[in-house]
């Protein structure tokens, strides 16, 4: 198969919750980072994902991201440490979805970072490490470009291009007296994570009744859909995206440039954010 498609990378067989998933994904990510092709953004998709945006729309959105990393942000769960409990990780850990939008500059840094290699080794002994990697890498930016926090012999930051401070966002969620927005559309994104739309009810497979809501969402892809469970939902969404690809609509990505992580990366302070309330929910919110 690889002789027919030279860019096809085949990983090892892996099981849910184990390091094998992260290992396979990271090896593909590293392969792409070392290519001479001048790609601009990496976007993860699984076999049960479907795009919600056309190529034209994705390009405009990724231009609006302006070099920032887009990953989900949630507190790390203590039961995931397993045998590593009590052993300091190379950087503070955060929980995130596997789906991430990563600029090329960040990819180039990550695959050459010794600290990232140490993080991968650490996570290989933890539970569901694929949901602990991206924001642990992207969410440990220093306060300023010249400041590095050190505790003992442990450096607590990563200078990844496009990164942000996840701990500040988690703190705001706990202390900000605001209501999260109900509207989440391409004209008013309403969230700070667009990597993937997913309903967290025991990994719910989306069906026909979900389609009207899914079509209006601002995310790049939807998870999960299956041709073995209400296949009409899969085909309806696919047909809609194909139609828009051949008949482009007026698409303005301005709202994506107003996402909090994009504005924080561009230099705005927390108090200067256009939509601070967009920080209040992660994709793990059930609602």
Task: Locate predicted features.
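ER/Golgi luminal nucleotide-sugar-dependent glycosyltransferases, focusing on the catalytic module
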Residues: 1-287
């Amino acid at each position: 198969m690889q002789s027919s498609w030279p860019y096809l990378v085949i990983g090892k067989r892996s099981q849910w919750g184990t390091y094998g998933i992260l290992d396979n994904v990271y090896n593909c990510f590293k392969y792409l980072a070392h290519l001479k092709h001048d790609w601009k953004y990496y976007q993860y998709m699984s076999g049960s994902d479907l795009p919600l945006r056309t190529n034209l729309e994705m390009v405009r959105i990724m231009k609006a991201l302006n070099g920032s990393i887009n990953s989900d942000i949630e507190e790390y769960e203590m039961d995931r440490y397993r045998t590593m409990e009590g052993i300091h990780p190379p950087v503070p850990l955060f929980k995130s979805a596997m789906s991430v939008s990563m600029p090329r500059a960040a990819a180039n840094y990550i695959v050459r970072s010794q600290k990232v290699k140490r993080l991968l080794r650490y996570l290989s002994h933890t539970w569901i490490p694929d949901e602990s990697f991206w924001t642990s890498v992207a969410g440990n930016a220093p306060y300023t470009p010249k400041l590095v926090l050190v505790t003992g012999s442990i450096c607590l930051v990563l200078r990844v291009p496009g990164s942000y401070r996840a701990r500040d966002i988690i703190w705001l969620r706990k202390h900000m007296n605001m209501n999260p927005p109900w509207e989440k559309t391409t004209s008013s994104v309403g969230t700070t994570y667009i990597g993937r739309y997913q309903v967290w009810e025991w990994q719910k497979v989306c069906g026909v009744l979900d389609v009207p809501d899914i079509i209006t969402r601002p995310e790049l892809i939807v998870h999960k859909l299956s041709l073995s469970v209400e296949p009409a939902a899969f085909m309806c969404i696919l047909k809609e995206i194909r139609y828009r690809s051949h008949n482009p609509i007026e698409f303005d990505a301005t709202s994506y440039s107003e996402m909090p992580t994009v504005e924080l990366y561009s230099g705005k302070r927390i108090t200067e954010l256009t939509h601070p309330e967009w920080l209040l929910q992660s994709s793990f919110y059930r609602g």
